[in-house]
Amino acid sequence: MAAPYQREQAAWIPKTRLGKMVAEGKITTMEEAFETGLPIKEYQIVDALLPDLVDEVLDISMVQRMTDSGRRVKFRTTVVVGNGNGYVGLAQGKGVQVGPAIRKAIENAKLNIIKVARGCGSWECGCGLTHTVPSQVEGRAGSLKVVLMPAPRGLGLAAGGPAKKVLEMAGYKDVWSRTEGETRTTINFALATYKALESTTTVRTRQKEEAQ
């Protein structure tokens, strides 16, 4: 079960323009932060604006590399963060120990946070609630393609492993999915799903422009 990210840290001293605006109380929501158009370069910005964010470790793998001084081992972790209500982030982290690698992945995932679009896009439903993707979207990572399609309320998440967890963290309840390619690599499966969700906002924006 995912748990809130808790870590002892020194008082945050923002270094970026957006960070200073958040610390001064000029920016109080993630939507306002995105509207500035400024990049999120400090994970503490997300901590401040999304205090209900939780994290889940999707994969931990050991990477070995031969050097002149001998064999060196590092751990590579894949983590997804989300608040179950429209925000999700995904990233990897590396370290000589598992703990620091996980913490780095969490921080990186927060820097990759996105707001996804939700709706009731299934012709089988029409309930008007925000429980599925608003339209069909797809994402690619390596040789893998993930296609997400609107599903009727009550179906659940018809997706496997990492994809299901990413969808849950983003706040989706019902989604059809289809994959093309190799799904055994956790990072590619999760990343392709994340990229598909990333395009939900693009699709929604384009539809609004066409309607005007």
UniProtKB/Swiss-Prot annotation:
Superkingdom of source: Archaea
Alphabetized GO MF terms: rRNA binding; structural constituent of ribosome
GO biological process entries: translation
Record bears the keyword RNA-binding: yes
This protein's UniProt keywords: Ribonucleoprotein, Ribosomal protein, RNA-binding, rRNA-binding
PROSITE patterns reported in the protein's UniProt record: RIBOSOMAL_S5 (PS00585), S5_DSRBD (PS50881)
Keyword Magnesium: no
Segments forming domain S5 DRBM: 53-116
GO annotation, cellular component aspect: cytosolic small ribosomal subunit
Chain's role: With S4 and S12 plays an important role in translational accuracy.
Subunit-structure text: Part of the 30S ribosomal subunit. Contacts protein S4.
Family label: Belongs to the universal ribosomal protein uS5 family.
Free-text comment about domains: The N-terminal domain interacts with the head of the 30S subunit; the C-terminal domain interacts with the body and contacts protein S4. The interaction surface between S4 and S5 is involved in control of translational fidelity.
Protein name in UniProt: Small ribosomal subunit protein uS5
Organism: Methanocella arvoryzae (strain DSM 22066 / NBRC 105507 / MRE50)
